[in-house]
């Protein structure tokens, strides 16, 4: 009989998290035995809660909002992609009390974009937001060699800092990322729009670029039972292929699960179908 692997997710809020069900389904497909729990915390208590979790036998944890960037400062070692992102969504214990911080968000997004037939290479992208979520996906998007990536953030200084960090790391040429404080300032047709802000959580509409390509597509990292406000905006603007971040959620979770449990990647198609079926 397999021993039970203790896993969890830290966030605030956290009661809504689908991670326990997703990982339970992964375990079902691989016949693993896991115990995956939600952990509510605050920024002040987050380091202690994480330390307690692993001290009491935790074997892996996810980190969600608002702790992804804080988690990057807690770990002993960062993976290359987590270092590039400046944010961590996966904690992996190794050695005596040591923690590796990784970030599977970008990988999850790229896999889901490919599943949906959305190509990034040589395309013009507009990414809304410059926070932890954007940091997690932009390095992986850049690896796909888009023609140009517009980073849209109300606080242009924050976006410029992110661009500068990426340039310093040698990940992007100076002309590959263009910063705009509003999408209205973009003066070329955009092929793919990605919302990495929390605007959809409060029903906030974003200003879209004035020019969209004929086959423009859109992706909201947020997800809900109904189309998000951002998705509705894009549909109204004529985008043909519009998706929420549910597929990314499943794919990044599968990457985390594989890091903890080893062996093959879980069957995400099965989990996606099960999660979309009303319980």
UniProtKB/Swiss-Prot annotation:
The keyword Transit peptide does not apply. GO terms for biological process: amino acid biosynthetic process; aromatic amino acid family biosynthetic process; chorismate biosynthetic process; shikimate metabolic process. The keyword Oxidoreductase applies. Its EC number is 1.1.1.25. The active site is at residue 68. GO terms for molecular function: NADP binding; shikimate 3-dehydrogenase (NADP+) activity. NADP(+) binds at residues 80, 129-133, 153-158, 221, 245. Pathway: Metabolic intermediate biosynthesis; chorismate biosynthesis; chorismate from D-erythrose 4-phosphate and phosphoenolpyruvate: step 4/7. It is an enzyme of class 1 (oxidoreductase). CDD domains: NAD_bind_Shikimate_DH. Shikimate binds at residues 17-19, 64, 89, 105, 223. It catalyses: shikimate + NADP(+) = 3-dehydroshikimate + NADPH + H(+). Keywords: Amino-acid biosynthesis, Aromatic amino acid biosynthesis, NADP, Oxidoreductase. Coiled coil: none annotated. One of its GO terms (cellular component) is cytosol. Involved in the biosynthesis of the chorismate, which leads to the biosynthesis of aromatic amino acids. Catalyzes the reversible NADPH linked reduction of 3-dehydroshikimate (DHSA) to yield shikimate (SA). Belongs to the shikimate dehydrogenase family. Homodimer. This is Shikimate dehydrogenase (NADP(+)). The gene is aroE.
